[in-house]
UniProtKB/Swiss-Prot annotation:
GO terms for cellular component: plasma membrane. Belongs to the LpxK family. One of its GO terms (biological process) is lipid A biosynthetic process. Its EC number is 2.7.1.130. This is Tetraacyldisaccharide 4'-kinase. Coiled coil: none annotated. It comes from Shewanella oneidensis (strain ATCC 700550 / JCM 31522 / CIP 106686 / LMG 19005 / NCIMB 14063 / MR-1). The gene is lpxK.
Amino acid sequence: MQALVNKIWYQGHPLRWLLLPLSALFAFITAFRRSLFRLGIKSQTTLPVPVIVVGNITVGGSGKTPTVIYLIELLRNQGFNPGVISRGYGAQFQGVKVVTVKDAATDVGDEPAMIVARTGVPMVVGAKRVETAKALLTQFAVDVIICDDGLQHYALGRDIELVVIDGKRGLGNRNLLPAGPLREGEWRLNQVDFVIVNGGPAVANQYEMQLRPCAVLPVSPAVTAEFDSTQPLVAMAGIGHPARFFETLTQQGYQVALSHSFDDHQAYDKRQLCELAASRPLMMTEKDAVKCRDFAQENWWYLAVDAKLSPQFDQQLLSRLRSVAAAKKGKSHGV
């Protein structure tokens, strides 16, 4: 099914035309929903600290999670104390939940588990963004909230919006769901503060981002050996765009004997992956690794990547953030 969807969205498959009436209905529903907030019929909650939303206007992986990790590290280096909220897609909990390094990905979601494992950032997950953000502020002394995904969740007031675009797949056929991959029209890019292009050329008023491999690490915390890069390996990925991961491995010179794609947010078990690896080294993404660490074998590895953005982006974002923070601080003191 996913292969057919990709053909419709990115390769001009004629079934797109049959889906266009449904896309028109989707456009009407989303426009109506936005108008409720614009007209004040539905309220938007403003928080006392700056809120940065990192999202996209397409379905599927675009690089939001590495962007969030980049922002966490950037803000910390500048003296901020950021916290993160997320939906926790596929997680098994009710209400809101604080994410810890001990939490399984099945309990809090793949991306939250990965973000906290990498950074240790204060993080709360929940279906309702406003409720989740308030819980974060109640339980942690954060001065900036980063919302991982949630561009279309207008009930949460935001001060800075970042959209991440896949530089290779772009916006596909530029149709709204289900005929195309768009959650909102291309016009939305003109309203956000920053457009980040992941792994592709950026045009005017956009910022290019590269995901650069930084280490090959064992999935199991108990393993102390280093990876032997001369061995042929089996590659697997359960992310929004697995082909990008496989291409990265090839570009890094690894001998990929077999590659296998899983669905995004796939749940794994030990026997399934042992059969796939067949005693060969198994290489996966960092997002997959957080789901496998409890039953990982000695020859299972993951490729850690770091996002790289320009100093110009850093400067523009920090300038905007400091301006927002000062204004909110002034209001809290009655200035």
